[in-house]
Amino acid sequence: MSKPEHIGRKITGSITAEIHGELNEIESPLFAINWFDTRIAIVYHLYNLLAASRVFKIGGKVLFKGKCGQAISGNTDLARHYLLIVNYPSGHRFLELLSDKVFQLMSVLRIAAVKRFSFVLHQRQGEPQLLPDGKSVIDPGDHYAVLQVRLPSQTNQSKAEAASFDFSALQRLAEQHNSQVFFASRVAGQVVLNKDKQNEADAMPFLTDVTVLVKSATAKNVLDCFASDQVENLLPAGAEYFAAQVKRTM
């Protein structure tokens, strides 16, 4: 991979937001992986309702929202209760959202409502990279499970490892258990907030170098798909992971 670059935008008088990654990726459609717990769930849901119009205004669309249920396997230190995946037309449009003063006011609710918040921008493996207009239809008979993978060190080397991650092996694993990969992605860009006057930079923390969602007609299929003996043999040496059922709500 070439030397990582970045794009940026001033979002307040003293803070510039940047996305660090390869320009050909972060200037393309991206998927924001929000993986978190809540302090006050009702406040978070209120924030979502209020912020939706600002996200839609810049072309953002929700791909998936769900609450984790039964843990399947892996390191529970990586576990969170909620997963939200949002598609953005490009990194530039996402930075436009961060600079929206109304969105910034609404984000006060999110900060108050969530904890152990992991956020990173991913590139999807496969299509569509940019979701079509219109709401997706949720089949109540579908069952989902998520696999979150953290690579050994979140550095330029780990981005290279994520780029070469063997998604085809997970596809075959899903098929063996009568399941299908609904969504698969890997890290493309990390958000960094620069405090201009203090010359300080704060990178938003994230746990998820790779995210994979599978779905099936039965809960047993997705549980079996991400059982520990199935997953561990497919991951790079030193990688950690967590897998859980997810109840889709959007």
Predicted feature locations:
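Short S/T/G/P-rich N-terminal loop/turn motif that feeds into the first structured element of a domain
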Residues: M1-Y82, P89-E96, K115-M250
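Ligand-binding face of N-terminal immunoglobulin V-set domains in extracellular IgSF glycoproteins
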Residues: S99
